[in-house]
Swiss-Prot record:
This is UPF0102 protein bll0669. Pfam families: UPF0102 (PF02021). GO terms for molecular function: nucleic acid binding. Belongs to the UPF0102 family. PANTHER family: UPF0102 PROTEIN YRAN. It comes from the Bacteria.
Length: 133
């Protein structure tokens, strides 16, 4: 089998990494459906910037919610998974999203978390963190 140009072998994700990716995609889909049922409009999913990624950007009336989705074995485990470092990356990414979407700059902004666990309804944590922390 020929090697790709440059001689490097292509990276192959471990089965654990593939499973985590699929779990994340499924959790984000559940979270988006839950938000839509609550009257939010999804503006972006998996929005990437050089600073980080925002799982979901959602709007309801004059509010923009930047939502971090966490899927774990329990809702409590999911709640502890949003670390201060991740919070700062999401805040930085949100600034990038707002720069790319200046029409939303005057909206109220909020940083939420959506906690997902098997056999549980999603838990939407409003204002889970803010840009001043």
């Amino acid at each position: 089998m020929a090697k790709p140009e440059g001689g490097a072998e292509p990276k192959v994700a471990s089965p654990e990494r593939v499973a985590a990716f699929r779990t994340g995609i499924s959790a984000e889909s559940r979270a988006a459906a839950y938000l839509m049922a609550k009257g939010y409009r999804i503006l972006a999913k998996r929005y990437r910037t050089p600073h980080g990624e925002i799982d979901i950007v959602a709007r309801r009336r004059n509010l923009i919610a930047f939502v971090e989705v966490k899927a774990r074995a329990s809702l409590d485990d999911a709640a502890y998974a949003v670390t201060p470092r991740q919070q700062q990356r999401i805040i930085d990414a949100a600034q990038g999203w707002l720069a790319a979407h200046p029409e939303h700059a005057e909206f109220e902004l909020r940083f939420d978390a959506m906690l997902i666990a098997p056999r549980s309804l999603p838990r939407h944590v409003l204002a889970a963190f803010d840009a001043s922390t």
